[in-house]
């Protein structure tokens, strides 16, 4: 894929269309924010954020909230990203230590479902040392029910298992994964009809 930038761009648009619902419309950003950061601080780091659609949505819907919004991804992905006012793009491998310290939100959308637990723990543990006491990790993923799973979530679960040896996770599985990483879920916000949720996570 890195050798075919046009295909990379198409893949990014396809991934955005698969989950068209915008997280920030269902998450109380201002309530969670508390005291707003000043312009020199970081509001959100969008880890593995692709073309930055979710970061652009946050900036668009909260134009008066100060603080940097930074999208991190691999260089071959960012090469196809379109610039946006108020959103920065930075090359970063999420298996390496998080370089941005003290952000309010460290946001991961559809990152962890690509990986089995061992790699997910590695990804999350790169973030923890960068967190300030007021920082929160936001995990935007499918949380599948134990029974009555929507067909979209069931299909994605099988696809993740076949393609990446990974899975879509239940609430209990997410909780167990966070525990392995030294984290805990303190709040959760469900939205859309596919069991999508934002899990608010802090160190134990």
UniProtKB/Swiss-Prot annotation:
Upregulation: The genes forming the sterigmatocystin biosynthesis cluster are co-regulated and induced on oatmeal porridge or the fungal isolates were grown either on oatmeal porridge or in YEC medium (0.2% yeast extract, 5.0% corn steep liquor).
A Pfam family per the record: Methyltransf_2
Reactions the enzyme catalyzes: 6-demethylsterigmatocystin + S-adenosyl-L-methionine = sterigmatocystin + S-adenosyl-L-homocysteine + H(+)
Catalytic EC class: transferase
UniProt-listed Enzyme Commission number(s): 2.1.1.109
Annotated catalytic residues: 113
GO biological process terms on file: methylation; sterigmatocystin biosynthetic process
Ligand binding (S-adenosyl-L-methionine): 48-49, 73, 93-94, 109
Keyword annotations from UniProtKB, A to Z: Methyltransferase, S-adenosyl-L-methionine, Transferase
Disruption of the gene: reported phenotype: Impairs the production of sterigmatocystin and leads to the accumulation of demethylsterigmatocystin.
Lyase recorded as keyword: no
Pathway in which the depicted protein is active: Mycotoxin biosynthesis; sterigmatocystin biosynthesis
GO molecular function: O-methyltransferase activity
Cross-referenced SUPFAM superfamilies: S-adenosyl-L-methionine-dependent methyltransferases (SSF53335)
PROSITE patterns the UniProt entry points to: SAM_OMT_II
Family named by the database record: Belongs to the class I-like SAM-binding methyltransferase superfamily. Cation-independent O-methyltransferase family.
General function of this protein: Norsolorinic acid reductase; part of the gene cluster that mediates the biosynthesis of sterigmatocystin (ST), a polyketide-derived furanocoumarin which is part of the most toxic and carcinogenic compounds among the known mycotoxins. The first step in the biosynthesis of sterigmatocystin is the production of hexanoate by the fatty acid synthase (FAS) units stcJ and stcK. The polyketide backbone is assembled by the non-reducing polyketide synthase stcA by condensation of the starter hexanoyl-CoA and 7 malonyl-CoA extender units followed by cyclization and release of norsolorinic acid.
Protein name: Demethylsterigmatocystin 6-O-methyltransferase stcP
């Amino acid at each position: 894929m890195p050798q075919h930038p046009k295909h990379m761009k198409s893949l990014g648009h396809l991934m955005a269309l698969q989950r068209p619902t915008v997280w920030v419309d269902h998450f109380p950003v201002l309530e969670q924010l508390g005291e707003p950061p000043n312009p020199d601080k970081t509001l959100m780091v969008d880890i593995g954020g692709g073309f930055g659609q979710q970061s652009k949505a946050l900036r668009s819907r909260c134009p008066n909230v100060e603080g940097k919004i930074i999208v991190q991804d691999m260089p071959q992905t960012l090469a196809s990203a379109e610039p946006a006012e108020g959103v920065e793009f930075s090359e970063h491998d999420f298996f390496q230590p998080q370089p941005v310290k003290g952000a309010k939100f460290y946001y991961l959308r559809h990152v962890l479902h690509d990986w089995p637990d061992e790699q997910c723990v590695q990804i999350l543990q790169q973030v923890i040392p960068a967190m300030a006491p007021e920082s929160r990790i936001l995990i935007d993923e499918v949380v599948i029910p134990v029974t009555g799973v929507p067909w979209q979530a069931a299909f994605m679960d099988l696809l993740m298992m076949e393609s990446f040896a990974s899975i879509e996770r239940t609430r209990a599985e997410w909780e167990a994964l966070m525990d392995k990483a030294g984290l805990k879920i303190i709040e959760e916000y469900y939205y859309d009809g596919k069991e999508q949720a934002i899990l608010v996570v802090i160190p134990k």
